[in-house]
C-alpha cells in the first residue's frame, strides 16, 4: 500500500480434515474478520453453513486480532467432526489506530479489507460473511454464479437505509443501489487489479471521512457500478430490536421465509445474548446445539449499548424486576461514563 503502513498478518493455526479423495476443484471459500467478541459467533455461523451444505466442499478462513485456547480447541473439534479445512490468521492492529471506529463497531470491521487482499494471493473467489450471519439453506449455487464482469455479488440494504445513504454520502446514484456489506461474494482478482483495499484505506484515512458505517460506506463508494445484486434470500436482514414492538413475536416470519438462505442478525442485540429468547433466533439455536459451543452460557451485557438493550428486552418479556435492575445498571454506567 502506498499510503498505509504494512499490516502484519500471520497464520497461527490450520486444520485440514478433508477426506483424502476429495475433489478440491470446486470449493466454496468462506471468510470472516472479527475481534474476540465475535469468535464464538463465527463458530456457530460455520456450523450453520455445514449443516445445510454437506454436499459441497467448504474451506473456512478466519482473521482476528486475538484468539484463546478455548476457541482453538472448539474450532479444531468442529473441523475434525465435519471433515473441514479451517485456517486462522492473526492480524496486528497496532497500525490500524489511524482508522475510524464507532461505539458499536471496533476496527475489526476493516479486517475484511485485509482478508480480500491476503486471500486474493491464493484464491479466485471468496464469500465474506459477518459473524452474525446464520445459514438456513443451500448456498451451493454460488459456486457456479456468473458475476458477468462484476467485482462482487451483494444484496441491497433495506429500504430505510437507501435514502439515508444517499443523504449521508451525497450521492443520488446510490438510491436503490446501496448494499449491505455483511454478505459479499467477491472476485478477488478483480478486487486486487483495481487496488480496492488500498483505495478504501486511503479514503478512510482522509480528514473528510464522515462515514457512519465506515467499511460498508467505503465499499459502496468504490464498488458503485461494479456489483451484481443477489436476491434478498442471500442476506435477509433481521434486527432483534424489532421484537420490542411485536407482542406476538411472530412477525419475523414475514422476513425470514422458507426461501431464506442467509439470515443477518443486525443490531446491538445478537442471537447469542442472554436476553435474545425469541422464536426468530431459532436458526441460530439449531446451529449452536450442533456445535462445540453448545454448552457455553449465553453472553451477558458488556458494553453500555448492550446494557441499554438488555433492560428493554427484559421488560418486554415481562421480567419486570430483572428489567428494572438492568435499567438501573444501564443508567449507572451511563452516568459514570460522563
From Swiss-Prot:
<dbReference type="GO" id="GO:0005886">
    <property type="term" value="C:plasma membrane"/>
</dbReference>
<dbReference type="GO" id="GO:0008919">
    <property type="term" value="F:lipopolysaccharide glucosyltransferase I activity"/>
</dbReference>
<dbReference type="InterPro" id="IPR002495">
    <property type="entry name" value="Glyco_trans_8"/>
</dbReference>
<keyword id="KW-0448">Lipopolysaccharide biosynthesis</keyword>
<dbReference type="GO" id="GO:0009244">
    <property type="term" value="P:lipopolysaccharide core region biosynthetic process"/>
</dbReference>
<keyword id="KW-0997">Cell inner membrane</keyword>
<keyword id="KW-0328">Glycosyltransferase</keyword>
<keyword id="KW-1003">Cell membrane</keyword>
<protein>
    <recommendedName>
        <fullName>Lipopolysaccharide 1,2-glucosyltransferase</fullName>
        <ecNumber>2.4.1.58</ecNumber>
    </recommendedName>
</protein>
<keyword id="KW-0460">Magnesium</keyword>
<dbReference type="GO" id="GO:0008918">
    <property type="term" value="F:lipopolysaccharide 3-alpha-galactosyltransferase activity"/>
</dbReference>
<feature type="short sequence motif" description="DXD 2">
    <location>
        <begin position="215"/>
        <end position="217"/>
    </location>
</feature>
<dbReference type="GO" id="GO:0046872">
    <property type="term" value="F:metal ion binding"/>
</dbReference>
<feature type="binding site">
    <location>
        <position position="130"/>
    </location>
    <ligand>
        <name>Mg(2+)</name>
    </ligand>
</feature>
<feature type="short sequence motif" description="DXD 1">
    <location>
        <begin position="130"/>
        <end position="132"/>
    </location>
</feature>
<keyword id="KW-0472">Membrane</keyword>
<feature type="binding site">
    <location>
        <position position="264"/>
    </location>
    <ligand>
        <name>Mg(2+)</name>
    </ligand>
</feature>
<keyword id="KW-0479">Metal-binding</keyword>
<feature type="binding site">
    <location>
        <begin position="33"/>
        <end position="38"/>
    </location>
    <ligand>
        <name>UDP</name>
    </ligand>
</feature>
<comment type="similarity">
    <text>Belongs to the glycosyltransferase 8 family.</text>
</comment>
<dbReference type="Pfam" id="PF08437">
    <property type="entry name" value="Glyco_transf_8C"/>
</dbReference>
<feature type="binding site">
    <location>
        <begin position="264"/>
        <end position="270"/>
    </location>
    <ligand>
        <name>UDP</name>
    </ligand>
</feature>
<comment type="pathway">
    <text>Bacterial outer membrane biogenesis; LPS core biosynthesis.</text>
</comment>
<keyword id="KW-0808">Transferase</keyword>
<dbReference type="Pfam" id="PF01501">
    <property type="entry name" value="Glyco_transf_8"/>
</dbReference>
<feature type="binding site">
    <location>
        <position position="132"/>
    </location>
    <ligand>
        <name>Mg(2+)</name>
    </ligand>
</feature>
<dbReference type="InterPro" id="IPR050748">
    <property type="entry name" value="Glycosyltrans_8_dom-fam"/>
</dbReference>
<dbReference type="InterPro" id="IPR013645">
    <property type="entry name" value="Glyco_transf_8N"/>
</dbReference>
<dbReference type="InterPro" id="IPR029044">
    <property type="entry name" value="Nucleotide-diphossugar_trans"/>
</dbReference>
<feature type="binding site">
    <location>
        <begin position="130"/>
        <end position="131"/>
    </location>
    <ligand>
        <name>UDP</name>
    </ligand>
</feature>
<comment type="function">
    <text>Glucosyltransferase involved in the biosynthesis of the core oligosaccharide region of lipopolysaccharide (LPS). Catalyzes the addition of a glucose (glucose III) to the outer-core glucose II.</text>
</comment>
Amino acid at each position: 500500500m502506498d499510503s498505509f503502513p504494512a499490516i502484519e498478518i500471520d497464520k497461527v493455526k490450520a486444520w485440514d480434515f478433508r477426506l483424502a479423495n476429495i475433489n478440491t476443484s470446486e470449493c466454496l471459500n468462506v471468510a470472516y474478520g472479527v475481534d474476540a467478541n465475535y469468535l464464538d459467533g463465527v463458530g456457530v455461523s460455520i456450523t450453520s453453513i455445514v449443516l445445510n451444505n454437506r454436499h459441497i466442499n467448504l474451506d473456512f478462513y478466519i482473521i482476528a486480532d486475538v484468539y484463546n485456547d478455548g476457541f482453538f480447541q472448539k474450532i479444531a473439534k468442529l473441523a475434525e467432526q465435519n471433515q473441514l479445512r479451517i485456517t486462522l490468521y492473526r492480524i496486528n492492529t497496532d497500525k490500524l489506530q489511524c482508522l475510524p471506529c464507532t461505539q458499536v463497531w471496533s476496527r475489526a470491521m476493516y479486517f475484511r479489507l485485509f482478508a480480500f487482499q491476503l486471500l486474493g494471493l491464493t484464491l479466485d473467489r471468496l464469500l465474506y460473511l459477518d459473524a452474525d450471519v446464520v445459514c438456513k439453506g443451500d448456498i451451493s449455487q454460488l459456486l457456479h454464479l456468473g458475476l458477468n464482469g462484476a467485482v462482487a455479488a451483494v444484496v441491497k440494504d433495506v429500504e430505510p437505509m437507501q435514502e439515508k445513504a444517499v443523504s449521508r454520502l451525497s450521492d443520488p446514484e446510490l438510491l436503490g443501489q446501496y448494499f449491505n456489506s455483511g454478505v459479499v461474494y467477491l472476485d478477488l482478482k478483480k478486487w486486487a487489479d483495481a487496488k480496492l483495499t488500498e483505495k478504501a484505506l486511503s479514503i478512510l484515512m482522509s480528514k473528510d471521512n464522515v462515514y457512519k458505517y465506515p467499511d460498508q460506506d467505503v465499499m459502496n463508494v468504490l464498488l458503485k457500478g461494479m456489483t451484481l445484486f443477489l436476491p434478498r434470500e442471500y442476506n435477509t436482514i433481521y434486527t432483534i430490536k424489532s421484537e420490542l414492538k411485536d407482542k406476538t413475536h411472530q412477525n419475523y416470519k414475514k422476513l425470514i421465509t422458507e426461501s431464506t438462505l442467509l439470515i443477518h442478525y443486525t443490531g446491538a442485540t445478537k442471537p447469542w445474548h442472554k436476553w435474545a429468547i425469541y422464536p426468530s433466533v431459532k436458526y441460530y439455536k439449531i446451529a449452536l446445539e450442533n456445535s462445540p459451543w453448545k454448552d457455553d452460557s449465553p453472553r451477558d451485557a458488556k458494553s453500555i449499548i448492550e446494557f441499554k438493550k438488555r433492560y428493554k428486552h427484559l421488560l418486554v418479556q415481562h421480567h419486570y424486576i430483572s428489567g428494572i435492575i438492568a435499567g438501573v445498571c444501564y443508567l449507572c454506567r451511563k452516568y459514570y461514563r460522563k
